[in-house]
Amino acid sequence: AKTVPGDYIVKLSVNDTELTQDFTIHKDPTSEGSIEDIKAQFEFVNEINSVVDEAHNAIENIRKIKKDLTKFQSDYADDESAKNLINESKLILESIDLIENELYQTKNQSNQDPLNYGVRLTNNLGNLNSAFRGGDFGPTAQDIMVKNELIKKVNIQLEKYNSIISEDIPGFNSNFKNLELDYLNVFM
């Protein structure tokens, strides 16, 4: 989205020196969109970007957790005392895998795969955002309705993710500590 026309201040800080400069962004005189349209577009795109960023951060964390839990399962597969904890880790893995797959298409390997597997929530939001790359018009009522529905669905997944992060992972870590297992396993 384009920056909304108006008056701005740019600030440059280097070490202890700070310089500021006022400047104005003018509306393109050939644009048919109003400043209100440009502002609505800017806010629309930024809201989507914010939600997609949050979802992508969750996906990155999910992938790290999956890697760590998979390693844990491998390291303690033969340890009878860790059997219940391994089962707990499998449940967490299953839950976060479902969340990741709702947020992002994980099966894409080729250009054909989005057709085979479909796009997911963050992809849909990104596609909606790309509709605003040209022009200075604000979102339509239908655009806003679709955005709100997609954001609602993303937020449901993020709530599930946050619940796992705030409840299941600390519970797993507590159980891990109670078993007094070695954190690092070195095999020679």
Where are these regions (language model features)?
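Short, surface-exposed loop/turn motifs with a glycine/proline- and acidic-biased composition
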Residues: 1-5
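Mature extracytoplasmic or organellar-lumen-exposed domains after removal of signal/transit peptides
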Residues: 7, 14, 21-23, 27, ...
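Low-complexity, Pro/Ser/Thr- and charge-rich linker/hinge segments at domain boundaries
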Residues: 20-54
